[in-house]
């Protein structure tokens, strides 16, 4: 779709990226048109608008839609007319085919600025836009050498970056697609020269967020140059790390480096930094926040909230929330691998229960800390409701605790869980597991057909306490009567 002057202005690597971008936008537009009864929705209109702004020809857009949907000229005109009639078209000329056929490259300031930003970000190589060091191995002389797999990883990230920076795709959609593409290839972790290793979702999110912010920073510096200013306002966001206290303030370009650490991994626009900076003109621009507002917001950030005996600032709470999300993503992958490996049913149910326990803790903690749940961070793997437990595999006891239905009793189980086994003659055993995953108690509603050994209760119902020696060897206690609370708790089976 690019015209010759645009192609000539782009290096080969960037041309490939933008051609791929156009193909993905067009494919997504066609998919949405098919899914919505050939109606151009607001989301589809936005994508077509961005496609044209990136240099696509109006006629070629029209022809591609017409061919893909097998429409006649009159049918296509009807679809286009509906958009104008609804009144939400961002550029009516796109559907009327009036005005310029395409935006000439020399007049396409947005495209020029995006290309210049990528050029600066990649030191004119137009590759590895996120500057990821994944799969880089440090050589004896101290230099870094990328493994062959790094090329595939970087190209996949580059696709994600142009999709997001173009404005045609939203962040979460691109993130989900990228993670799915990499995990489907068999990639599970990303390894770094430092010896650090991350699961794919964590590595992708960090690389894309960091890379995107750095490209935006390049655009903002270009804007500053055009405005003739050397002063910038750094954005402020809740939950920032303590060392990023400078959010919401004004700094010169030099101070962005000396004070805010611009260019450093742990500084402004570094790894996992959500701050950005925009040009301002002293004497004309007005700060977003007053000093008093910033002081009040920072005080709120440092206010501590207690949960389970521990106090958390906003940053500390967000860090724990991120850890719980990471744990849930890992647990979802474990479930997927168990299912693919056709593991036994108890193991799969056990993995799902672990996920459910973490998920419940995530809800409780988020509510206690007044933090919004960010389930999209967990569901980004595209595995949907993989952690859902079949209704016939979990029930409630008399006081509402979850009971997991399993096929056999094991001494090791899910920490802080209760399982239930039904024996061949219909008797029920409930197994209790402590914080370390060891079984510490069993409650039975029968005498195991050994009435002399279990002369308890009305029907032989009894309990066994489990203890362990210093080597972890089981010391199983003799049977005993149920306490009143145990009878109340298990009244549904007694």
Model-derived features: where do they sit?
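Conserved beta-strand and immediately adjacent loop positions that scaffold enzyme active sites
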Residues: 274, 429, 464
């Amino acid at each position: 779709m690019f015209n010759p002057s645009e192609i000539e202005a782009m290096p080969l690597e960037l041309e490939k990226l933008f051609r791929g971008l156009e193909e993905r936008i067009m494919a997504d537009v066609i998919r949405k048109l098919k899914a919505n009864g050939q109606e151009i929705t607001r989301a589809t209109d936005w994508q077509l608008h961005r496609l044209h702004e990136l240099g696509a020809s109006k006629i070629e857009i029209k022809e591609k839609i017409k061919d893909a949907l097998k429409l006649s000229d009159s049918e296509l005109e009807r679809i286009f007319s509906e958009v104008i009639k609804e009144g939400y078209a961002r550029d009516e000329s796109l559907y009327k085919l009036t005005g310029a056929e395409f935006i000439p490259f020399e007049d396409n300031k947005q495209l020029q600025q995006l290309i210049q930003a990528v050029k600066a970000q990649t030191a004119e190589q137009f590759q590895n836009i996120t500057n990821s060091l994944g799969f880089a191995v440090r050589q004896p002389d101290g230099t870094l050498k990328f493994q062959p797999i790094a090329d595939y990883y970087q190209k996949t990230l580059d696709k994600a970056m142009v999709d997001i920076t173009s404005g045609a795709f939203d962040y979460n959609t691109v993130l989900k697609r990228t993670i799915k593409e990499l995990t489907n290839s068999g990639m599970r972790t990303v390894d770094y020269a430092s010896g650090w290793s991350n699961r794919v979702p964590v590595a992708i999110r960090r690389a894309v967020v960091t890379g995107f912010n750095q490209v935006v920073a390049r655009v903002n510096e270009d804007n500053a140059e055009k405005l003739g200013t050397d002063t910038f306002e750094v954005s402020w966001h809740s939950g920032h790390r303590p060392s990023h206290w400078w959010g919401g303030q004004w700094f010169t370009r030099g101070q962005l480096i000396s004070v805010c650490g611009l260019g450093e991994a742990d500084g402004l626009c570094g790894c996992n930094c959500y701050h950005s900076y925009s040009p301002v003109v002293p004497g004309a621009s007005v700060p977003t926040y007053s000093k008093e507002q910033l002081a009040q917001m920072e005080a709120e950030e440092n206010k501590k909230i207690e949960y389970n005996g521990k106090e958390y600032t906003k940053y500390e709470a967000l860090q724990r929330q991120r850890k719980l999300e990471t744990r849930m993503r890992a647990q979802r992958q474990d479930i997927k691998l168990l299912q693919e490996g056709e593991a036994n049913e108890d193991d799969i149910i056990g993995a799902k229960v672990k996920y459910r326990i973490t998920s419940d803790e995530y809800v409780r903690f988020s509510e206690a800390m007044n933090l919004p749940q960010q389930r999209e961070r967990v569901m980004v793997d595209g595995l949907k409701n993989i952690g859902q437990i079949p209704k016939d595999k979990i029930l409630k006891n008399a006081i509402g605790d979850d009971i997991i239905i399993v096929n056999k009793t094991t001494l090791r189980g899910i920490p802080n869980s209760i399982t239930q086994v039904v024996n061949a003659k219909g008797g029920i055993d409930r197994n209790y597991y402590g914080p370390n995953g060891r079984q510490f108690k069993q409650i039975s509603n029968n005498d195991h057909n050994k009435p002399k050994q279990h002369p308890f209760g009305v029907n032989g119902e009894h309990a066994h306490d489990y203890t362990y020696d210093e080597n972890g060897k089981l010391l199983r206690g003799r049977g005993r009567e149920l306490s009143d609370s145990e009878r109340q708790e298990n009244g549904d089976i007694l």
